[in-house]
């Protein structure tokens, strides 16, 4: 999905790299606002209230993710940086859940409503779990890294360092939550096949191409994200994230909202 999960902090980036990081996801903010407007208008014209709600939630979560990421990279100072890092990583969970929402309410809602509401509840529950986890994890980091000034030279503050094993363990937990959320979409598809419901009745083939194409672009971006020794790798990864989001917007706009037919 949009971010790599639970990795230790990357080496410090230059001011030029952070500017590029801010600009690339600032672009995402603008495109997300446009996507929200277009999806909601299309849903209002061609769909039902359920389609409007799904499109609005998805578009809003896109804006939230890109806005938090832009601010995180643009702001300076360790305290505010850590706060917005929590917001940034929490927004990932919200975007995953938000991306599921129109598919749960509209695509599955029209063909497999029980599955639609089940996946909807599970994915948003996992999002809440993930956000809680991130808050606790980074709260622990803050206590260790944001050291208060000593009271005097005889009574320095007592700070417990974070165990590297703890960081790795929390990283694995975070990764498992992301993976569980990302792969939930396979469950109703397989259940539909077992139950005799063709996948095409849930989502047209071209819609599936956009859906899984977006996931593939996100995954390729994760590989770019891992190239920490390459300058501006983070900004390049941001462009992959924007591309993955665009694919999912096209899937919703042209193949989830009723009456819309497109590429």
What residue ranges belong to the model's regions?
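Multi-pass alpha-helical transmembrane bundles in non-GPCR membrane proteins
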Residues: 1-263
């Amino acid at each position: 999905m949009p971010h790599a999960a639970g990795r230790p902090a990357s080496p410090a980036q230059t001011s030029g790299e952070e500017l590029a990081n801010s600009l690339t996801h600032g672009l995402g903010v603008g495109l997300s606002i446009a996507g929200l407007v277009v999806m909601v208008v299309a849903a209002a014209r061609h769909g039902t209230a359920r389609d409007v709600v799904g499109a609005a939630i998805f578009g809003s979560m896109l804006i939230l993710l890109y806005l938090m990421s832009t601010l995180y990279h643009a702001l300076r100072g360790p305290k505010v940086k850590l706060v917005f890092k929590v917001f940034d990583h929490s927004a990932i969970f919200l975007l995953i859940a938000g991306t599921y929402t129109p598919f749960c309410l509209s695509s599955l809602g029209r063909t497999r409503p029980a599955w639609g509401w089940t996946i909807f509840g599970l994915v948003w529950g996992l999002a809440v779990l993930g956000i809680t986890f991130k808050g606790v994890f980074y709260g622990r980091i803050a206590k260790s890294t944001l050291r208060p000034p000593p009271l005097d030279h005889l009574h320095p503050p007592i700070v417990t360092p974070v165990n590297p094993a703890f960081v790795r363990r929390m990283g694995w937990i975070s990764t498992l939550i992301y993976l569980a959320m990302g792969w939930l979409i396979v469950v109703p598809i397989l259940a539909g096949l077992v139950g005799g419901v063709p996948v095409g009745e849930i989502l047209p083939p071209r819609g599936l191409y956009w859906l899984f194409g977006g996931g593939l672009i996100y995954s390729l971006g994760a590989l770019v994200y891992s190239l920490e020794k390459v300058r501006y790798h983070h900004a390049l990864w941001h462009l992959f994230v924007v591309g993955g989001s665009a694919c999912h917007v096209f899937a919703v706009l042209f193949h989830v909202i009723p009456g819309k037919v497109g590429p």
